[in-house]
Design a protein with these regions (language model features):
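Conserved phosphate/anionic-ligand binding catalytic regions in large, soluble enzymes, centered on
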Residues: 8-26
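A structural-propensity feature for long, helix-poor, extended segments
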Residues: 41, 45-84
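A conserved regulatory-domain signal marking ACT and ACT-like small-molecule sensing domains
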Residues: 91-94, 118-225
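Contiguous domain-boundary segments centered on the initiation and propagation of an alpha-helix
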Residues: 66-116
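Short, hydrophobic/aliphatic alpha-helical segments
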Residues: 1-10, 40-42
């Protein structure tokens, strides 16, 4: 435990779980969509559903979808900012089985029709855990730089990606492989110690068998004062 676990994050709003964590969940959805969200359906579970509006959870999630960090002074005005940005959204309640009480499910779509469904929980102190991506079970926190690689479930895809990362001297901190079924589409979630540059992400996306690569840059939040 460090001092930030005790004091919590720098943020706007009354609750690190309901506001800071919610903003990070929204921003994670935006980042992994890989484009500007134009439509969003936000579903709140448990404590998020019961007290989320009063604690500003709904505004924080929308703020994250707009690219705001937890300390952004515009968070209380996120609904107005969404209208300016052309982001159409709905917020409702959902009852999930075996989910953390501070859980949100976000379905987002960009102007080109690209879609993403993300389920994540705010676990305290502004920290989050992503539990599902497009219905596939995952587990990552956003505490590391994170690559999400969608690929055909075939021999060589994992080796190709990890070989390139090794050549770039990028150390893998954690990695998980997830799939619906053998031979279908799969997900690699790769958390790294080092920053990955935009052109390097693009190169990985061109590898055989790779469907898409999105990248969550932890440094984007670390640089916020």
């Amino acid at each position: 435990m460090d001092i930030f676990d005790i004091l919590g994050p720098v943020m706007v709003g009354p609750s690190s779980s309901h506001t800071a964590g919610a903003a990070r969940i929204g921003k994670m959805a935006r980042t992994l969509l890989g484009g500007e969200p134009m439509e969003a359906r936000i579903h709140l579970h448990g404590s998020f559903a019961e007290t989320g509006s009063g604690h500003g959870t709904d505004r924080a999630l929308v703020a994250g979808l707009l690219g705001m960090n937890p300390d952004d002074m515009r968070i209380p005005f996120a609904f107005q900012e969404a209208e300016k940005a052309g982001l159409h959204f709905t917020v409702d309640k959902i009852d999930l089985r075996d989910a953390h009480p501070n859980t949100a499910v976000i379905e987002v779509r960009d102007a080109h029709g690209k879609q993403l469904e993300l389920q994540a929980a705010s676990i305290g102190g502004g920290r989050i855990v992503v539990n599902k991506l497009d219905g596939i079970d995952v587990s990552f926190t956003g505490d590391y730089n994170t690559l999400v690689v969608r690929n055909h479930d075939e021999n060589g895809a994992l080796a190709a990606v990890t070989t390139i990362l090794s050549q770039l001297r990028i150390n893998v901190a954690n990695m998980s492989l997830c799939r619906h079924k053998r031979g279908g589409d799969a997900l690699m979630v790769i958390e790294t110690d080092q920053h990955i540059k935009t052109h390097q992400v693009s190169f990985l996306a061109e590898l055989p068998g790779i469907l898409s690569v999105t990248y969550y840059d932890k440094e984007d939040e670390d640089h916020v004062s």
